[in-house]
Amino acid sequence: MNKLKQYECTVIIDGGLQDDAIAAAMELVKKTITDQGSVINNVLEVGRRKMAYLIGKSSVGYYAHIEFDAAPSAIAEIERVFRYEENILRFLIIQLSSPLLEMRKRVEKYSVMLGSPEDQAEPESESTAKS
């Protein structure tokens, strides 16, 4: 058995579809990944966004980002299914390298230490808010 490696996939689904069709396409994406013996770690559904250029006749796409562990041999089959699915406009699967994973850990560590800009903002007092 091949050792599992970490991958991330960004998918653009036709944004002109109804919500239930987009949900069905997302389920197909997840099912395709898990059917190959892969384990999904994280799914981030960004939602509908205007694309920089037309793909086919679509100007709006539904963006999703999936992180998963898979055997290298499974990637070709996942790509084959995505390529022939008409509702998937574009996709990109990349293998996460060690330097990228180390950088992500450092960014997470420092963002936890420093906090977000919203955490550092001073709350408005009632007197300043009314002025």
UniProtKB/Swiss-Prot annotation:
Family annotation (CDD domains): bS6
Source domain of life: Bacteria
Cellular component annotations (GO), alphabetically ordered: cytoplasm; ribonucleoprotein complex; ribosome
One Gene Ontology term from the biological process aspect of the record: translation
Cysteine pairings via disulfide bonds: none
Record's keyword annotation contains Ribonucleoprotein: yes
Pfam family, one: Ribosomal_S6
GO molecular function per UniProt: small ribosomal subunit rRNA binding; structural constituent of ribosome
Cited InterPro entries: Ribosomal_bS6, Ribosomal_bS6_sf, Ribosomal_S6_plastid/chlpt, Transl_elong_EF1B/ribsomal_bS6
Annotated keywords: Ribonucleoprotein, Ribosomal protein, RNA-binding, rRNA-binding
NCBIfam families per record: S6
Family: Belongs to the bacterial ribosomal protein bS6 family.
Function recorded in the entry: Binds together with bS18 to 16S ribosomal RNA.
Protein name (record): Small ribosomal subunit protein bS6
